[in-house]
Amino acid sequence: MTNIRKTHPLIKIINHSFIDLPAPSNISSWWNFGSLLGLCLMIQIMTGLFLAMHYTADTMTAFSSVTHICRDVNYGWLIRYMHANGASMFFICLFIHVGRGMYYGSYTFMETWNIGVLLLFTVMATAFMGYVLPWGQMSFWGATVITNLLSAIPYIGTTLVEWIWGGFSVDKATLTRFFAFHFILPFIITALVIVHLLFLHETGSNNPTGLNSDADKIPFHPYYTIKDLLGVLMLILFLMMLVLFFPDLLGDPDNYMPANPLNTPPHIKPEWYFLFAYAILRSIPNKLGGVLALIMSILILALLPFLHTSKQRSMMFRPITQALYWILVANLLVLTWIGGQPVEHPFIIIGQLASISYFSIILILMPISGIIEDKLLKWSL
């Protein structure tokens, strides 16, 4: 009798995706973050569902309802902080996952990569709208500043902003629709994740060498299920350490003050995972230019397949590009730091230089280094 997992219409799909899936024998721990992102998404959907049971999307009661969750609901504080810090873990895993794809040339799987970029945008939109829901000072002013950026769009800008607000300022209508979108988007993300995996399983996984691994495949289970389990345990350990010991480490103290349209906080800034993009936005003195730079800072990822000049797929054997890659990582850390600083000297010039470096490395220096390395390789043979 044939095994049920190979014959049953539904179980067969799971079998081909997670059990009998042929995987390269040499993929490293950098390949663990895909499954960790799946775990983060599940944690966020489950904790978010329980939070939504007690939350009220109304300007008068939103802040109080979050307080009520933390004080009166059984383990409400745990659910709330798991959701807030779970978002941070989500973005840490996302950045590593994207960074891995850049380093090892995974972007040559065009469909998988482009859906990944779309997923990144969707997750960022979801996180932004979620940050507005507690209706603290930073929630309100963050929403005001970021939605206001759309007014930079010529001709339709102002109308568009007021349409999104549902009025002449961020108010009840805005909060209600943000809650609706914040609730529905994770399910859209889940659907996109399935498509992401569907395209990935058409080609099979990449590996650190960037070479074809068809000749040396191993089954996903038990080898990578047990390897993923280690990653899962480490992620949960790290998340629970944050939640139970330092729940407010990554948050803004201003968000513990109820939203007040008459009182602007001294420094309006988003959550830490948006600071690099926020720094790029602020580094350009022109409003429309800043918005375009902000969008391009993420959309540039979609250009990577077209900017690849090397004959080698991975950076594993390309020391010049490797050096540029790690300079880019350091540059992103500088941008993250600058995004959290006030707009004054010397932070303005540092932010501008870091923004120029960011685009220069990806658009100019990396493609050039790919050509140079190919030449060096040709001469050495």
UniProtKB/Swiss-Prot annotation:
InterPro entries: Cyt_b/b6_C, Cyt_b/b6_C_sf, Cyt_b/b6_N, Cytb/b6-like_sf, Cytochrome_b, Cytochrome_b_C_euk/bac, Cytochrome_b_N_euk/bac, Di-haem_cyt_TM. Its cofactor is heme b. It holds the Pfam family Cytochrom_B_C. A ubiquinone binds at H201. The chain crosses the membrane at residues 33-53, 77-98, 113-133, 178-198, 226-246, 288-308, 320-340, 347-367. Binds 2 heme b groups non-covalently. Keywords: Electron transport, Heme, Iron, Membrane, Metal-binding, Mitochondrion, Mitochondrion inner membrane, Respiratory chain, Transmembrane, Transmembrane helix, Transport, Ubiquinone. Signal peptide: none annotated. Belongs to the cytochrome b family. The cytochrome bc1 complex contains 11 subunits: 3 respiratory subunits (MT-CYB, CYC1 and UQCRFS1), 2 core proteins (UQCRC1 and UQCRC2) and 6 low-molecular weight proteins (UQCRH/QCR6, UQCRB/QCR7, UQCRQ/QCR8, UQCR10/QCR9, UQCR11/QCR10 and a cleavage product of UQCRFS1). This cytochrome bc1 complex then forms a dimer. This is Cytochrome b. It comes from Chrotomys sibuyanensis. The gene is MT-CYB.
